[in-house]
Structure formats: structure tokens, C-alpha cells
Amino acid sequence: MALVSSRATQDSKPSRERIVPVVYYLSRNGRLDHPHFIEVPLSSHNGLYLKDVINRLNDLRGNGMACLYSWSSKRTYKNGFVWYDLSDEDFIFPVHGQEYVLKGSQILDLDNNSGNFSAVTHRRNQSWSSVDHYKVYKASELNAEATRKLSMDASTQTDDRRRRKSPVDEVNEVTELSREEITSPPQSDSSPETLESLMRADGRLILLQEDQELNRTVEKMRPSAVLMQLISCGAMSFKKCGPTLMNGNTRSTAVRGTGNYRLERAEKELKSFGRVKLEEKEYFSGSLIDESSKKELVPALKRSSSYNIDRSSRMGLTKEKEGEELARANFIPRNPNSVVGQP
């Protein structure tokens, strides 16, 4: 009976395992979680090793959980405590008696592309990892689509700017051409002008038309001849003289013998009104326009017959003298060779 009892005690001793209490902390993003308490069986009679703690954590919290952290133990150093980094085969020294304190710091992986630290995560459930991959894929796809839309919008805006720029350039060119073609603006009726200055201005307009038609026709009068003919026309109405020159006809509508009558008529207008009254308004904007056919002028106030008779009697004495002076000023001797048609 004594031998049986001794053998039973010997068999029971190896079956009894030593278990030590361990307190550990988990550090995530620089913060310590609430402490955890576990009991770790010892694999060696020498004491506790880190591999014993890792095996216990894998059994309790899933395989590979402990590999996500770097472990260190609390040790006394001089008058304080320090964290002592450990590897799998390192021995863990107790703090006081059989008290073990560990800390697990989350391992950080350096991302070479972005230069930032990202935590290494390993999920136990594969379905969650597939969902994460799907989210990442969708996010990347959305980013690519957004980038494509932005590029398309940028190209569209560039095309629109180019399309808008070309009409603006055309409008600017047309505006510049019109400004170059337009001569001095027409003066109002209130500005006093003489008949000679108006005829000279109209003559310059006709000269522009004549210069443009020189390349098309062969037989044309020179600008100097046209100007001389206009000056020699005297007080002849521009409506009668102008169109003949614009049409390229070399024959003038002026008739000899009627010059004195027209001079008297112009003199009456100058004396009665004190300024030139244009019955036919003509402006230049690239071409001659006769606005008399489009607009009707406001009828001017007519003088009474007695007023006209009295005024004509007072001016009768000086009419002939002033007519001769005006004829001398308007009529200039011409060279027959310079003008094709005689006025």
C-alpha cells in the first residue's frame, strides 16, 4: 500500500502545472487601454517567458493577435521603473515577488508612398476584410471617375474659351475696320458752316469711292480732277452733282448759263437764315446714305410775303456786287485736259 501511494504522488506532481498571474496593457495610438488580467501556465521551471504569454493570448483572443503588438515588461531600475523590450524567447522578470506586468504596443508600418505610419491590422473574420476591400475598390473607382470628369470639364472649358475667343476676335477686327473706314463724324445742324466747306467734305467722300473703283474701271478721272470739278461746280446742289460722280460718269450735270441763278439762290439762303440749312442730310459710314428718302424733315417756318418783299428790296442794291465776288471765289479756271467732260 505504501508503494502505491508513493507512485500516485509521483505521478500527480508532473501533472500539476505552475500558473502565474499576468497583468498586461495594450497601447493604441499612444494611449493605454484598461489593463487586462490573465493566468499564464509556465512551460519551464525557470520562470515565465514571453512565448508563454503569446501562446496564452492566441488561445484566448485569437490566433495571431499577440503578433500585432511589440511586448515589453515592467522592471525596476535604480529608484524607478522602466519598460524592458522583449522578444519571444526572452525571460520575464517579476516586479515584486510573483507579480508580472506587460505592455503591448501596436506595431506601426511605414508607408513608403505617402510617408505616413499606418497601423497593421489583421482581421479574424474574412467577410469583414472582403467588405473593406470592396469599400477601397469603390473609393478608388469613384476617385478615378471624379478625376476623369474634372479633366473632361477642364477640356470643355478650354474649348469653350477658344470658341468664345474667335468670335470676339472677329468682332474686334470688324470694329477696327469700321473705325478706319469712318471719317470725321457728321456735324449737327446747329454748327455754322459754309456751302464751300460742305462741298469740300462731300468731295473727299466721293474721292474715296473713286479711289476704290480705280482698280475696277479703266477710264476714271484723277482725284485732283474730281476735286477741281467739285470746286468749279460752285453752289450746285450735291444731290445733283454727287451721284453722277459716284456712278463713274464723266459727264457733269452742271449746265452753262445756270451758274448765276444757283449763286443767287445760295446767296439768298445764306442771307435769310444766317447759316446753311441742309435739306438733304448725308452721312458716311462706309457708304453714302441719303436719309431724305427715309426721314421727313420738320417743316420750317415760312416767312410772310410782305417780310420777304421788304427784305429783298433792302438787299437789292448789294446783290449784284456780292454775286460777282462769290462767283470769283467759287469759279476757278480749269485746264480742259484735266477734266474729261465739260461742266
From Swiss-Prot:
Disulfide bonds: none annotated. A motif (Association to cell membranes) lies at residues 233-234. Its main location: membrane. One of its GO terms (biological process) is response to salt. Expressed during embryogenesis and in roots. GO terms for cellular component: plasma membrane. Residues 18-109 are annotated as: DIX-like oligomerization domain. Keywords: Auxin signaling pathway, Cell cycle, Cell division, Cell membrane, Developmental protein, Membrane, Stress response. Residues 148-194 are annotated as: Disordered. It holds the Pfam family SOK. It is a peripheral membrane protein. GO terms for molecular function: protein homodimerization activity. Residues 184-194 have a biased composition (Polar residues). It is found in: Cell membrane. Changing D85A: Severely attenuated polymerization. 'Soseki' means cornerstone in Japanese. PANTHER family: PROTEIN SOSEKI 4-RELATED, UPSTREAM OF FLC PROTEIN (DUF966). SOSEKI proteins (SOK1-5) locally interpret global polarity cues and can influence cell division orientation to coordinate cell polarization relative to body axes, probably by guiding ANGUSTIFOLIA (AN) polarized localization. Positive regulator of auxin (indole-3-acetic acid, IAA) biosynthesis and signaling pathway leading to the modulation of seedling growth, plant and inflorescence development. Negative regulator of stress responses (e.g. salinity and osmotic stress). Homodimer. Forms long polymer filaments with other SOKs proteins polymers (e.g. SOK1, SOK2, SOK3 and SOK4) crucial for polar localization and biological activity. Binds to ANGUSTIFOLIA (AN). The DIX-like oligomerization domain is required for polymerization, edge localization and biological activity. Belongs to the SOSEKI family. This is Protein SOSEKI 4. It comes from Arabidopsis thaliana (Mouse-ear cress). The gene is SOK4.
